[in-house]
């Protein structure tokens, strides 16, 4: 067993060896290294064929038309293109956007930018389990609402939003619906023929593909128009200029093809691991699972251990690669804004740890983790005067602390 054990699959996945093998074939002189936009010779034609094949593999995962797939540098760029691109194209119709407080920064920050440009954005509060109340969403919709952006699966707590129902509400009012599916594409079924979703952001590296490549699904019927954010050679039907990275695109296509083929197997494997981990730590008293446990992807377990500082716990678990808060914001010591939005107090939000596992995680690694967590939590609580007070039955919320 290799240490430290990797439990941060929601931040990124290792590239599947089958994917890496396909990618290497698109790099060197004796491989398929051409520019897909070079239409005058065989090197370009072969590269274009590989890109078209990958486009089909990605479309296949969504049950979409390959012409609806636009390649980008990742889900962050896809989110920016979808949100700013749609808002700017349709701004004559209205300047109101709806999103949720627990979205990824790649959605919240473009929305903040739109606010600076004169748009109005409504940030919905989720319920305590992380799920959005559809009545609240419906109440927030207005005549001038042009876009709703809601993520499919949350990166910190793994809860699954009811995208199908939200899509129905949006379509009935002719509002464009964007979904950030970075954490769900390849993990749970996504069918654009069944779901009324107009724009979907995807990333390769959350599904055992390479980093630096993603895609945006742009619906053709009814046709969705976007204002390009990247200008140049007019690649990707004008949506996103820039030479296509054949090796990365081939990697993404292969990763999504494998994800489709192994989806049930991967799902069952992750669920068994999560149940094993939760069973091993849930009797540690004052343990809270953050986010709904049923409406959730099995690859994620976000737990708060009361009276234990998250940073101290991470340091004590040096043989486990886990995260406190999400990777994109965990450089700061601020408590997770996602957990705060669920109504957790600062202490519980600070004491949260996200375990995320995947295709290459083993039962042996889970058992090792359980033993490490139990030792670390008990040791840190033994050092905590607050834990002693809690054990003595003192309600800490009623204690008046002296300010120095």
From Swiss-Prot:
Catalytic EC class: transferase
Single GO molecular function: 2 iron, 2 sulfur cluster binding
Pfam families: Aminotran_5
Keyword Repeat tagged: no
GO BP term, pick one: [2Fe-2S] cluster assembly
InterPro entries xrefs: Aminotrans_V_dom, Aminotrans_V_PyrdxlP_BS, Cys_deSase_IscS, Cysteine_dSase, PyrdxlP-dep_Trfase, PyrdxlP-dep_Trfase_major, PyrdxlP-dep_Trfase_small
Keyword terms: 2Fe-2S, Cytoplasm, Iron, Iron-sulfur, Metal-binding, Pyridoxal phosphate, Transferase
Pathway: Cofactor biosynthesis; iron-sulfur cluster biosynthesis
EC number of the protein: 2.8.1.7
Residues that coordinate or bind pyridoxal 5'-phosphate: 75-76, 155, 183, 203-205, 243
Transmembrane recorded as keyword: no
Reaction catalyzed: (sulfur carrier)-H + L-cysteine = (sulfur carrier)-SH + L-alanine
Cellular-component GO terms for this entry: L-cysteine desulfurase complex
Highest taxon, organism lineage: Bacteria
Catalytic residues (positions): 328 (cysteine persulfide intermediate)
N6-(pyridoxal phosphate)lysine: residues bearing it: 206
Residues spanning the signal sequence: none
Compartments where found: Cytoplasm
Obligatory cofactor(s): pyridoxal 5'-phosphate
Residues binding [2Fe-2S] cluster, per UniProt: 328
Subunit structure and binding partners: Homodimer. Forms a heterotetramer with IscU, interacts with other sulfur acceptors.
Similarity-based family: Belongs to the class-V pyridoxal-phosphate-dependent aminotransferase family. NifS/IscS subfamily.
Function: Master enzyme that delivers sulfur to a number of partners involved in Fe-S cluster assembly, tRNA modification or cofactor biosynthesis. Catalyzes the removal of elemental sulfur atoms from cysteine to produce alanine. Functions as a sulfur delivery protein for Fe-S cluster synthesis onto IscU, an Fe-S scaffold assembly protein, as well as other S acceptor proteins.
Name of the molecule in the record: Cysteine desulfurase IscS
Lineage: Bacteria, Pseudomonadati, Pseudomonadota, Gammaproteobacteria, Vibrionales
The gene coding this protein: iscS
């Amino acid at each position: 067993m290799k240490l430290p054990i990797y439990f941060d699959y929601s931040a990124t996945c290792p590239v599947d060896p089958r994917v890496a093998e396909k990618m290497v074939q698109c790099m060197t002189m004796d491989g398929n290294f051409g520019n897909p936009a070079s239409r005058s010779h065989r090197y370009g034609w072969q590269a274009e064929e590989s890109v078209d094949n990958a486009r089909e593999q990605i479309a296949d995962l969504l049950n979409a038309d390959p012409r609806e797939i636009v390649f980008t540098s990742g889900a962050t760029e896809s989110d920016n293109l979808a949100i700013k691109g749609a808002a700017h194209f349709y701004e004559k119709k209205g300047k109101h956007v709806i999103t949720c407080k627990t979205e990824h920064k790649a959605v919240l920050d473009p929305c903040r930018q739109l606010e600076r440009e004169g748009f109005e954005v409504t940030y919905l509060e989720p319920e305590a389990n992380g799920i959005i109340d559809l009545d609240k969403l419906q109440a927030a919709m207005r005549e001038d609402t042009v876009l709703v952006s809601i993520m499919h699966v949350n990166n910190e707590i793994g809860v699954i939003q009811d995208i199908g129902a939200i899509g129905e509400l949006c379509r009935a009012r002719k509002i464009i619906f964007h979904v950030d599916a970075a954490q769900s594409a390849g993990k749970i079924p996504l069918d654009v023929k069944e779901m009324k979703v107009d724009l979907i952001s995807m990333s390769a590296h959350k599904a055992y593909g390479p980093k630096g490549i993603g895609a945006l699904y742009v619906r053709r019927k009814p046709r969705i128009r976007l204002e390009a954010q990247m200008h140049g050679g007019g690649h990707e039907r004008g949506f996103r200029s820039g030479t296509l990275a054949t090796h990365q695109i081939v990697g993404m296509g292969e990763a999504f093809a494998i994800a489709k083929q192994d989806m049930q197997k991967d799902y069952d494997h992750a669920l068994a691991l999560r149940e094993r981990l939760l069973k091993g730590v849930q009797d540690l008293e004052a343990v809270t699972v953050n986010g709904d446990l049923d409406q959730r992807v099995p690859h994620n377990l976000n737990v708060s251990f009361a009276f234990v500082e998250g940073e101290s716990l991470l340091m004590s678990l040096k043989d486990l690669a886990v995260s406190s808060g999400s990777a994109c914001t965990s450089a700061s010591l601020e408590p997770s804004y996602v957990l705060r939005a669920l109504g957790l107090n600062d202490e519980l939000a600070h004491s949260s740890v996200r375990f995320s596992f995947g295709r290459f995680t083993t039962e042996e690694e889970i058992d090792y983790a359980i033993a490490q967590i139990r030792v670390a939590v008990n040791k840190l609580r033994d050092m905590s005067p607050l834990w002693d007070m809690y054990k003595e039955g003192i309600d800490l919320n009623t204690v008046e602390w002296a300010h120095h």
